[in-house]
Amino acid sequence: LSFLNSRLNVSGDAYVRNTTDMLVPGKTLPAVYGAASPQQNAGDLRTKGYELVVSWKDQFDLKGKPFNYGVSFVLGDAVSEITRYDNPNKLLANHYEGKRFGEIWGYRIDGFFKTDEEAANWKIDQKLVNTQIQKAPGEWGHLRAGDLKFRDLNGDGVISPGKKTADDPGDMEIIGNSEPRYNYGLNLNASWNGFDVSAFFQGIGRRDWYPSANADKFWGPYSRPYFSFTPKNFNDLVWTPENPDAYFPLLRG
């Protein structure tokens, strides 16, 4: 669509893309098998998305010479869903039919324990998610003020992953999505008297991230220098009795 003597242009597309027979890992095998599942063409994916482009171009005289300029903005988004995968039990360790690509499953937190007494009298069993705490010696082997309170979503009094399936995830739920959303770009250009200049900016509106084992190393585990990556303001972000509204829980060794 063009407006204002073709100076303003708007275009858009919406699409549905079906990807069939994707090469994916086979069904999870028992550990006693001693090998990974072979890859096979056994997955289908449906992607729904759109793209919108708005542009403006014009010119005017500057010191007797034409000054041309243009601005364009692009916005796009897409969501993908697994439509076929050999995982009838919907194990969370694999893809499953109906799964939105990039799902992040995890536990919800209800803040920190305010006092040692509250932690000691906590009725919800958190042993499965507090294995590192239980390994600590002495009083540090128990919940204390500043430790995390996990949310008991299924109300059974025990924090657990259930059967680790989409139908029985225990106290886990979808807490985010790692796929980028709302991709956008801005292009600026201008020309005058034989000179040209242009600039391009791009980004995404949203993307959730969950740290993996080496996620604190920006360049990955095999390119990192071996020194501390602790942020400069880390002490201000850790829970203490004087800082009960901290971002991080109680610091443990």
Regions found by a protein language model. Give the residues of each.
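Transmembrane beta-barrel architecture of outer-membrane proteins
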Residues: 7-9, 37, 47-51, 68, ...
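Conserved small-residue
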Residues: 40, 59-176, 218, 228-248, ...
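Flexible, surface-exposed loop regions and adjacent strand-edge segments
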Residues: 26-35, 86-96, 214-224
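Outer membrane beta-barrel strand-and-loop segments of large Gram-negative receptors
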Residues: 11-58, 108, 147-150, 157, ...
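Outer-membrane beta-barrel proteins
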Residues: 19-25, 63-65, 79-86, 206-212, ...
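Transmembrane beta-barrel domains of outer membrane proteins
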Residues: 1-2, 13, 53-57, 74, ...
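Transmembrane beta-strands of outer-membrane beta-barrel proteins
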Residues: 8-10, 69-71, 186, 192, ...
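Transmembrane beta-strands of outer-membrane beta-barrel pores
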Residues: 14-20, 58, 75-81, 192-194, ...
